């Protein structure tokens, strides 16, 4: 048996039992090479529909297709070996009916071999979450700020900053948890509300702009590496790779123009007879 095949990949139940335990570490990845790096340090990798913004330059995640998610999901699965890989269900692939959601989720699971899917929406998606969970598809929920709903929200603004608006968000979390989600992402929600939700539901919460009290945290990899031109308030930059990459490219361009690259060590001599 090879070393790689002996490594056990984390599963949705592994994350589920981390409620009130060691915080869950999660990042996004869309490529095999970044997945290999993330895999060494994270419990889970999200192949997020944020790839629409990060990889393709879309203003929102709305244009992202199922085929795009499957393609990058396959890449991340090939690059990783230990972390649970969760693939986002993109806008338009699951909202029509629970049957539509099932067909889309089956494609994702079969074609990428990932361990779970994620979908946005609260109480209105509870029936769908239950339908998928009962049929062997682990579902990660996503409440609070739901980027796929940008056209009805109007802007990417934090949710629940007035206590009068807490009840619907609390109901969303409760409904998704009771429907069978193994964990729930809470995005851009007022800290006291995120803390309250975490304390009141039985499944792990994973915060992004929520609370340190959540059972885990997730960020977009490119945001925390300093590769994104703009980052949300909730991002802490653990690197500043943008300028470093640009400096390397500029150095390459200088060497090509001056014929300093390639050097003798980079070219092939004739074989000696």
From Swiss-Prot:
It is found in: Cytoplasm. Its EC number is 2.1.2.11. It catalyses: 3-methyl-2-oxobutanoate + (6R)-5,10-methylene-5,6,7,8-tetrahydrofolate + H2O = 2-dehydropantoate + (6S)-5,6,7,8-tetrahydrofolate. GO terms for biological process: pantothenate biosynthetic process. GO terms for molecular function: 3-methyl-2-oxobutanoate hydroxymethyltransferase activity; magnesium ion binding. Its cofactor is Mg(2+). Keywords: Cytoplasm, Magnesium, Metal-binding, Pantothenate biosynthesis, Transferase. Belongs to the PanB family. HAMAP family: PanB. This is 3-methyl-2-oxobutanoate hydroxymethyltransferase 3. It comes from Bradyrhizobium diazoefficiens (strain JCM 10833 / BCRC 13528 / IAM 13628 / NBRC 14792 / USDA 110). The gene is panB3.
